[in-house]
Amino acid sequence: MKALQLQEYKKLELVELPMPVCGPEDLLVQVQACGICGSDIHGFDGSSGRRIPPLVMGHEAAGIVVEVGVSVVGFREGDRVTFDSTVSCGRCAYCRAGTINLCENRQVLGVSCNEFRRQGAFAQFVTVPQNIVYKIPDSLSFEHAAMIEAVSIAIHATNRTPRHIGGSVAVVGAGMIGLLCIQTLRLAGFAKVIAIDLEDSKLKIATQLGATHTVNARSEDAVAVVMAITNGRGVDASMEVVGAKAPVQTCFQIVRRGGSVTLVGNLTPSVDLPLQTVVTRELSIYGSCASNGEIPQCIELLASGAIQVAPLITATAKLDETAQWFDRLYAGEKGAMKVIVKPNAV
């Protein structure tokens, strides 16, 4: 089969690889669409330490089942499916407690690190265990279904955030996940959703997708603007979707007394904690990692049109065009958001 392999950092090659072997509890999926994730871009240059070459990356995917393992139940050849990116063991204490995203033996598709190596979906075929696979309706395109993994991260982050129906929330970072969080937070009942970013183009999309207010932190004092919007009180909740020092600090500065800060971005390994602010204002901090069983909910929300992903898709690409898109995305091409790879397109 054809696959796009990271041969060394910043070097992707189209290669021929053996067909994946379908284990007894696995499904062999012909990949119809796979999104290029921001984490793939960070892995491309080795900065994340989680894409050690040689590796086939890609974890946001959808496709058609072409083979089922002998122990698989509930799936058959021809099923249209998507799948989670996190492979959980189902046996550890966290899995048994229902927190599969915290699995002690967790692996991630398209990731290689010191603990494991798992080939991903920038290939014509991929094998995935049946416990992370979900059927999708005929009405949902493969391109949109490839966005479900990203949507599940936004849904999980929203589920981790205390609800304030009619309340206010600020999303710091209007990238892909941030723009999805804006939609899920509106669905959760927040009346004021404030998008904060450094680029007007992203803030324009944020408005189209439901943000009631936008703030360009490059040209405006974000804290002052948010305080003006909330009559000096601060937002009920803030959500950081970048993973860097400055936006994390902004989240703590704009939240009201007794409010909450949800941390989704994890680009920077560590940031300073404003300890006295957290203690004296009695703030609650929530980490949000991947998703925890929200994919069926995401499928329903996309199929019904409650969440829009079409405005976030910049382009589709064949497998032999994908390396060029990695270069463009790595260079920070303005206006580029999600690129969907179609490994079996001719």
Predicted regions mapped to residue ranges:
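Short N-terminal strand-loop motif that marks the start
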Residues: 1-62, 124, 342-346
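C-terminal hydrophobic helical "lid"/dimerization subdomain
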Residues: 3, 249-253, 292, 296-346
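Glycine-rich cofactor phosphate-binding loops and adjacent beta1-alpha1 units
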Residues: 161-165, 204-284, 346
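Glycine-rich beta-strand-centered segment in the early N-terminal region that forms part
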Residues: 20-34, 47-96, 137-139
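Mid-domain Rossmann-like dinucleotide-binding core that forms the NAD(H)/NADP(H) cofactor-binding site
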Residues: 131, 138-220, 224
